[in-house]
């Protein structure tokens, strides 16, 4: 009887450990599967000096009256997910083509402000995520969140973009709550 009881206890203990490992593993891999969005902006007089920021952090400036002139965006952590974006440029309008996966959108050295942006996800996993983004626009401050290709900014109103925040979330998640609206300098 004692041997049977030890076998039962050993079996139950092994079962609990196995379930814990499986459950913890699946939760960890699910949490780790949310990709990282990384981006940098070219700022009037500052260039690319700010460097790359990620996951909703502010890129650019606020309260300094400096225009964004170009942006590069990429997604990391999911080989089946890409990102495309295009900007509305002072006196040029919307770019004809989307830039993608770290390519430059906007201008450098032309003293042209970005006025609006559209961002969308691509790839076989694009249907699993939403991309949210918002901009800090001249005279308006932080605007509301746009997502999945919607326009964020002031196309046609001749207002410069000064800052941007971008994040990728699981499909159907609500817009992020107010992220800190401070720059990353």
Name every feature range the model reports, one short phrase each.
Residues 32-185:
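Lectin-type carbohydrate-recognition ectodomains
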Residues 19-34:
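Sec-dependent signal peptide cleavage junction
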């Amino acid at each position: 009887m004692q041997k049977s009881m030890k076998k039962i206890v050993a079996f139950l203990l092994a079962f609990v450990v196995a379930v814990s490992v499986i459950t913890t593993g699946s939760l960890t891999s699910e949490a780790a599967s949310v990709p990282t969005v990384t981006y940098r902006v070219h700022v009037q007089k500052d260039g690319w000096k700010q460097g790359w920021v990620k996951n909703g952090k502010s890129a650019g400036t606020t309260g300094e009256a400096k225009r964004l002139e170009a942006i590069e965006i990429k997604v990391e952590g999911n080989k089946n997910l890409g990102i495309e974006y295009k900007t509305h440029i002072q006196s040029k309008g919307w770019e004809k083509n989307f830039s993608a996966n770290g390519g430059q959108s906007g201008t450098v050295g032309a003293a042209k402000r970005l006025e609006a942006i559209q961002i969308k996800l691509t790839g076989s996993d694009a249907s699993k995520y939403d991309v949210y983004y918002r901009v800090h626009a001249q005279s308006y401050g932080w605007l509301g969140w746009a997502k999945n290709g919607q326009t964020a900014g002031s196309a046609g109103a001749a207002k410069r973009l000064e800052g941007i925040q971008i994040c990728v979330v699981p499909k159907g998640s609500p817009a992020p709550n107010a992220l800190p609206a401070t720059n990353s300098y």
